[in-house]
């Protein structure tokens, strides 16, 4: 994994997850920033690997390297616990699609990029244009290999919801691969802020 292009992201993440303060700003700053940084790293690496997920071994090494870099810049040493992140979060998990070519075959990538390449945080939280495009793409790739049950029935299954959520991570990584690292992080943070605000008012 090449961390050079994400050097500034890692620096910002280290500040947002600074030592003693990390647990107190976990949901507001630290964890969304950490998740965005990891998503951007995997998305950018897919340009060379054609994979939007890491295998188990590489995922362990990658997360460990990220931790070491962040700790070296003053971040908390307990980020895995604080943010409930593990190496499995860097894999495809239950999503049946992880290769870029397969992704492009199943998703209207032009529509997805148009909706998510540049979002206005306020408008996105109100109208959820990018969010809906991501959900549509995630649902599409989650359906790969599902022939036994019809789509409407499968939506009621807990396993289907988990799969769609795992595929959502794949979609976010693809989006990150199409944007420069700093702008990709901005888009991802905008989306996570909307999700957090939605949770507060539900």
Predicted regions and their residues:
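Extracellular/luminal segments of secreted precursors and ectodomains of membrane proteins
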Residues: 1-202
